[in-house]
Amino acid sequence: GVWSQYLEVGIGPDAEIFTKSQAMSAVGSGFDVGLHPGSSWNNPEPEIVLVINSKGHVVGAAMGNDVNLRDFEGRSALLLGKAKDNNASCAIGPFIRLFDDHYTIDNVRTTDLSMAVHGPEGFVMQGSSSLSQISRDPLPLMTHDPSTLAWQLTLLNPFMQKRPLMDVGSKQWDFEQLEIF
């Protein structure tokens, strides 16, 4: 009997597209990821980032970590912008792989993502997913706004129900190791 706006994501006639990665939100591999000081429940979202040139053509892909502020988003879907667009909240890298004869969008379509979070006191959370399970093909989505530099495709969205994965009282994630493979 409980309804959530997320129950219908990916099945309606309209693609759920929102902007991400304002100029100050993207950071490279190895840099600190930013968290909003008012958030106490946030988690990583490993994603595939599509790189698009100025003509709107997808030219490559990279790994991405789209940090999500669960407590903000959970209060209201209207806070999605605040939950997503924060300084340094979108880590990209460690490299961009350009498409060529051996690596194409078809490879991206079948990419499997796995993630493991190793935290204090032996806490471990693991998850995996395949982009082959995503509800929409990425290429038609790229025509929505060809001026965009990078798009992220999310399927793996790890979180523990009603329990913050990471406490950021010190503005640092409370885990020892994050692996995306």
Question: Where are the predicted features?
Answer:
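Active-site microenvironments in enzyme catalytic cores
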Residues: G1-G119, G127
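Active-site neighborhoods and metal-handling regions in enzymes and metal-associated proteins
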Residues: N107-L149
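A conserved acidic, glycine/proline-rich C-terminal tail/linker
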Residues: P138-F181
